[in-house]
Amino acid sequence: MSSDIHQIKIGLTDNHPCSYLPERKERVAVALEADMHTADNYEVLLANGFRRSGNTIYKPHCDSCHSCQPIRISVPDIELSRSQKRLLAKARSLSWSMKRNMDENWFDLYSRYIVARHRNGTMYPPKKDDFAHFSRNQWLTTQFLHIYEGQRLIAVAVTDIMDHCASAFYTFFEPEHELSLGTLAVLFQLEYCQEEKKQWLYLGYQIDECPAMNYKVRFHRHQKLVNQRWQG
C-alpha cells in the first residue's frame, strides 16, 4: 500500500519536559482531522512517523532535538542474533497467545511492573482507568499478546493490528524474571506477524541516548525513518 500522505491538519502542543531525556524539552504534533482515525489511515501515518496514545495520533515535533527516530522491522527479512536465538532456546517452556482482551489478573502484573520499573513516571501510581485511557482506542483493532510460564501470566504486549502491519504499543512484564521478557515479547510479536503475513512490525521510537529505548536496533532487519525516508 502507498505510504504517502498529503496535507493533514495538525496542532502543536506547548514545550514540556521530555519523558525520555529529562534535560530537554519536547513537543508533539497531533493529527486533528477525525477522518485520520481509521485503521487504513493510521497504517499510512505509522509509515510517516506517527504513533498513538489512546485515541490521539501524534509525532515528535521538537524545536532542536531529533533523537526520536521511528523504527520498524521488515518481518519477511527478520534475522535473529545469537543472543536472541539463545533467549528463545531458554524460553522453550514458555507459551504465548494473542487475545482480544487481557486476562482478569493483568492488573496485578501491571502494578508490579510499574512500581518496580516506572515509579518516577507518569503511569505511577498504577490505575486501571489510566491504563485503559492510554491503551484503548475506538477505531483500531488492538489485541494483547500474553506470555505464560505454565499457567502463570508473566507478560502482556499490547499490539495494534492492521492489514499489512502490526505496531508494538506497550509491554509490561514480571519485573524480577530472569529472562529478558521485553525482548521476548517482540520476538513473539514477530512470530505472530509471520503467521499473519504482515510486512512490518513497528516498534515506536528509537532513542540512542535513552537506555530504556535504545534496544530496538538489536532487531534485524530494521529500518529507521530519517529525514522522512526509511533507511536500513
Curated annotation (Swiss-Prot):
Catalytic activity, EC: 2.3.2.29
Broad class of the protein's primary localization: cytoplasm
Keyword Membrane included in the entry's annotation: no
Annotated family: Belongs to the R-transferase family. Bpt subfamily.
Reaction(s) catalysed (UniProt annotation): N-terminal L-glutamyl-[protein] + L-leucyl-tRNA(Leu) = N-terminal L-leucyl-L-glutamyl-[protein] + tRNA(Leu) + H(+); N-terminal L-aspartyl-[protein] + L-leucyl-tRNA(Leu) = N-terminal L-leucyl-L-aspartyl-[protein] + tRNA(Leu) + H(+)
UniProt-listed GO biological process terms: ubiquitin-dependent protein catabolic process via the N-end rule pathway
GO CC annotation, single: cytoplasm
Localization per Swiss-Prot or TrEMBL: Cytoplasm
Name of the molecule in the record: Aspartate/glutamate leucyltransferase
Organism of origin: Vibrio vulnificus (strain YJ016)
MF GO annotations: arginyl-tRNA--protein transferase activity; leucyl-tRNA--protein transferase activity
Alphabetical list of InterPro entries matching this protein: Acyl_CoA_acyltransferase, Asp_Glu_LeuTrfase, N-end_Aminoacyl_Trfase, N-end_Aminoacyl_Trfase_C, N-end_Aminoacyl_Trfase_N
Keywords from the named record: Acyltransferase, Cytoplasm, Transferase
Gene: bpt
Function comment: Functions in the N-end rule pathway of protein degradation where it conjugates Leu from its aminoacyl-tRNA to the N-termini of proteins containing an N-terminal aspartate or glutamate.
